[in-house]
Amino acid sequence: MPPRKRRRQCQKAQLLFHQQPLEGPKPHYESHQQPITHTVQVPSKPIDQSTITSWVLPQFDTAAESRFPTHRKHHRDQARHPTRRSTCKFPRLTFESPESSSSETLLLSNREQLQNSEKDAPRRPLVPLFSPQSCGELSVHVPQSLPHVFMPPDIQTPGSSVREDPISPDQKENSLPSCILGPRTPRTPEPGPVLVKDTPEEKYGIKVTWRRRRHLFAYLKERGKLDKSQFLVKT
């Protein structure tokens, strides 16, 4: 077997200096701090703790935070699990304007009514939107809710001076389409502004620079000062 290599000592010996440091021995783990020589005395004024926060509204008072101590560990868990719903620990702010408060109460009551109606209503089987079954249901329910005859948007209705004759429910059902929400033919978009005009046949093969200078081009061509190679495109 080959002889084992001797491990070298990693710790090197401390360097030795012939001269001692001028400022004395320096500590190994502490920075040298200079002594404080210049001190300034500032006149102090007593502070009244009761008047410091007199301008702060009670809803923004820091005492509310002391009632609900913060839990750092809980916040870390929330960051790890973002799907959990976060609950507000601080009291809601109250506003003085009555309009905003009334609108908020109306919104809350409407949401509760919608949730209750969704819970109470029996679940129906899902039906595609444009299936014949859904079209039949729409044609049954729509005539009862519509007071007048359904008119397509493309047909111009007469003015308000023309009186409408009373129509029987049988005629209403016949006049309505089988499915109101049926697919409509898309309207063709109107043509936009012309960005670049087409080149007329007279100017085919002529360079663009001479197309923009028609008077100069005709003048030089009549005088014979332009060769074909100067104004015609090479093919």
UniProtKB/Swiss-Prot annotation:
A motif (D-box) lies at residues 123-130. A motif (RAD1-binding motif) lies at residues 54-60. GO terms for biological process: cellular response to ionizing radiation; cellular response to UV; DNA damage checkpoint signaling; double-strand break repair via alternative nonhomologous end joining; positive regulation of G0 to G1 transition; protein localization to site of double-strand break; recombinational repair. Residues 162-173 have a biased composition (Basic and acidic residues). Interacts (when phosphorylated by PLK1) with POLQ; promoting POLQ recruitment to DNA damage sites. Interacts with RAD1; interaction is direct and promotes association with the 9-1-1 (RAD9-RAD1-HUS1) complex. Interacts with RAD18. Interacts with TOPBP1. Interacts with UBE2N. The RAD1-binding motif mediates interaction with RAD1. Residues 96-106 have a biased composition (Low complexity). This is RAD9, HUS1, RAD1-interacting nuclear orphan protein 1. Residues 66-106, 156-198 are annotated as: Disordered. The modification Phosphoserine is found at residue 50. It comes from the Eukaryota. It is found in: Nucleus; Chromosome. One of its GO terms (molecular function) is chromatin-protein adaptor activity. Keywords: Cell cycle, Chromosome, DNA damage, DNA repair, Nucleus, Phosphoprotein, Ubl conjugation. A motif (KEN box) lies at residues 171-175. InterPro entries: RHNO1. One of its GO terms (cellular component) is chromatin. Involved in microhomology-mediated end-joining (MMEJ) DNA repair by promoting recruitment of polymerase theta (POLQ) to DNA damage sites during mitosis. MMEJ is an alternative non-homologous end-joining (NHEJ) machinery that takes place during mitosis to repair double-strand breaks in DNA that originate in S-phase. Accumulates in M-phase; following phosphorylation by PLK1, interacts with POLQ, enabling its recruitment to double-strand breaks for subsequent repair. Its main location: nucleus. Residues 69-87 have a biased composition (Basic residues). Phosphorylated at Ser-50 by PLK1, promoting interaction with polymerase theta (POLQ). Pfam families: RHINO.
